[in-house]
A protein has these predicted regions:
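Solvent-exposed N-terminal domain segments of exported/luminal and surface proteins
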Residues: 1-104
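Generic structural signal for short, flexible, solvent-exposed coil/loop and linker residues
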Residues: 6, 47-49, 87, 105-107, ...
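Residues at beta-strand starts and edge strands
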Residues: 11-13, 54-56, 124-128, 139-141, ...
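Residue-level recognition of well-ordered beta-strand positions that form the cores
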Residues: 18, 59-61, 131-133, 146, ...
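Short helix/loop capping segments that flank catalytic or ligand/cofactor-binding pockets
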Residues: 28, 139-141, 167-168
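Short loop/turn segments at secondary-structure transitions that flank enzyme active sites
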Residues: 34, 64-66, 134-136, 151, ...
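Extended, loop-rich substrate-binding clefts of extracytoplasmic carbohydrate-active enzymes
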Residues: 92-150
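Acidic (Asp/Glu-rich), glycine- and aromatic
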Residues: 144-168
Length: 168
């Protein structure tokens, strides 16, 4: 089960999210009516115009702990941050697709995933593939995440990075 995060708060950069169905990428177009804005005195249309609308990231749900409930199993939200859960676990640290100039005197650069392609799994599939495009002033990258949820969730990450200039 896919759940999209709305742009807003700390997460102001929209990302493109696509679903791969029968080997074709299908964009998941932003629709304000997908979200419940509650009692806020702002219409979804106003929010779209103010923030540019869009999705900030996504999470996937899977029956980790029970066959009757879909638990959050992985989340991609903000810059190149992602994290996954195993059965009975709680979130701890997040991982990053790439850290550039971390703890340097000139300041850290935060590369960001700008587009995702989520391969729609077949019924009863044991894994899901997620592809991502990473971009920053210093680097570009292409990622393949193979997520295998379970007692010990495993995520195989393959990345191809291309540097535009030297980094620390």
């Amino acid at each position: 089960d896919l759940q999209l995060f709305h742009v807003g708060g700390m997460f102001t950069a929209p990302v493109a999210v696509n679903e791969i169905i029968d080997r074709k990428a299908v964009p998941l177009t932003y629709h304000p009516e997908f979200f419940d804005y509650g009692k806020n005195e702002i219409s979804p249309k106003d929010f779209e115009e103010v923030r540019g609308g869009g999705y900030a990231g996504f999470r996937l749900h899977y029956p980790l702990n029970s066959l009757t409930y879909l638990d959050e199993v992985v989340s991609f939200l903000g810059a190149s941050y992602f994290r996954a859960l195993g059965q009975g676990h709680k979130y701890g640290l997040s991982a990053r697709g790439l850290a550039i100039d971390a703890a340097s005197m000139k300041g850290e650069e935060f590369p960001a995933f700008t587009e995702f392609y989520i391969q729609k799994p077949r019924r009863n599939a044991r894994e899901i593939k997620i592809f991502a495009v990473l971009d920053s002033p210093s680097a570009a990258g292409a990622y393949r995440f193979t997520l295998k949820p379970g007692k010990d969730t495993v995520m195989d990450v393959d990345a191809a990075l291309y540097f535009r200039k030297p980094v620390e």
